[in-house]
């Protein structure tokens, strides 16, 4: 009887020990699994996060450049990047080497003009955007690439007052054929530039009565056109004066002027999938018409480019209404375009 009770007690103790060991082992396994899961979460998050460092945005020295550069800066800042603004650096001869050397990371460019800058003025740029972009890509130095071109193009154009355009029935450059009594006004170098007077003569067969040396779509051209001192003025196709004066810009129906789509030129070492998506988003919102209106707000109405850029991006739904604009690093000193110069 005593042995029987002792045997049952030993069995009970053995079962209890085994049960405790099983529970303890289960707890360790659960703890290890929890630790493993906890440890894997930061790694997964790290893989999904994009590294957002500093990006330097540069521009040449006219307002449209600063306007678009500021749009690039704002969308990158909104996504969490640290942005340094280096605006109004000078001409393309200064800005593009800065991009190539890594002093800046992004700058707005113009397809045809950049192609001719890089190929030494070989005359390869055409009116076709894709063709010109393809040729430009072949000329780009290592480490620099072009993102998606915008629809907006800033290039040489011929403008008339509403009254003169109606009188001539002109909507295209070809409509000026046979009008040999017209006076053309433009920059002093126009008679020597292949995309200016010689180009209109050779491509369209135009014959002007005379040429007045003024400026490149600036105040002298504006005054002369509005006063009737000239009949046709050489302008840039996105300048604000077009909207302010309600000029008629003639369609370049024979494609004399090369494609000059506003396009981000970017150093490849900052691209991470997100940067190009953000900058391409800006490009997709830009058209020649809305850039004219934005330039008018700056050049004619006197608004600050940073404010205009932020307002536009908010209206397009690219930035939230509360996103602010940081001040530019340099004051504006030149409001004339160089895209087609």
Each language-model region and where it sits:
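Extracytoplasmic "Venus flytrap"
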Residues: 39, 45-70, 87-91, 189-191
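Short helices/loops that flank or line small-molecule/ion binding pockets
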Residues: 70, 74-75, 93-104, 120-122, ...
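Ligand-binding "clamshell"
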Residues: 118-147, 227-229, 241-254
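A conserved helix-loop-strand patch within extracytoplasmic ligand-binding domains
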Residues: 127-184, 284-288
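A bilobed periplasmic-binding-protein/Venus flytrap-type ligand-binding module shared by bacterial periplasmic
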Residues: 156-166, 260-273
């Amino acid at each position: 009887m005593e042995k029987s009770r002792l045997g049952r007690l030993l069995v009970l103790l053995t079962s209890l020990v085994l049960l405790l060991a099983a529970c303890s082992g289960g707890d360790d396994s659960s703890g290890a699994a929890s630790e493993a899961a906890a440890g894997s979460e930061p790694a997964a998050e790290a893989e999904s996060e994009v590294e957002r460092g500093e990006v330097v945005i540069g521009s040449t020295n006219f307002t449209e450049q600063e306007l678009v550069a500021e749009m690039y800066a704002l969308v990158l800042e909104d996504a969490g990047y640290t942005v340094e603004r280096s605006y109004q650096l000078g001409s393309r001869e200064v800005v593009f080497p800065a991009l190539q050397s890594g002093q800046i990371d992004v700058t707005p460019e113009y397809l045809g003009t950049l192609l001719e800058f890089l190929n030494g003025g070989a005359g390869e740029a055409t009116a076709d955007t894709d063709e010109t972009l393809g040729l430009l890509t072949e000329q780009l130095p290592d480490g620099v690439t072009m993102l998606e071109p915008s629809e907006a193009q800033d290039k040489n154009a011929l403008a008339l007052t509403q009254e003169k355009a109606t009188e001539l029935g002109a909507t295209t450059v070809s409509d000026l054929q046979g009008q040999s009594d017209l006076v053309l006004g433009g920059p002093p170098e126009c008679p020597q530039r292949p995309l200016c007077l010689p180009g209109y003569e050779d491509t369209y067969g135009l014959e002007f009565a005379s040429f007045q040396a003024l400026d490149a779509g600036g105040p002298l051209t504006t005054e002369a056109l509005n006063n009737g001192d000239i009949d046709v003025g050489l302008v840039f196709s996105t300048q604000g004066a077009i909207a302010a004066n309600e000029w008629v810009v003639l369609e370049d129906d024979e494609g004399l002027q090369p494609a000059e789509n506003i396009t981000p030129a970017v150093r490849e070492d900052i691209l991470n999938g997100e940067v190009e998506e953000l900058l391409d988003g800006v490009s997709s919102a830009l058209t020649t018409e809305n850039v004219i209106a934005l330039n008018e707000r700056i050049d004619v109405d006197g608004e600050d480019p940073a404010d205009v850029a932020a307002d536009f991006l908010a209206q397009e739904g690219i930035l939230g209404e509360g996103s602010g604009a940081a001040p530019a690093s340099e004051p504006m000193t030149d409001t004339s375009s160089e895209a087609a110069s």
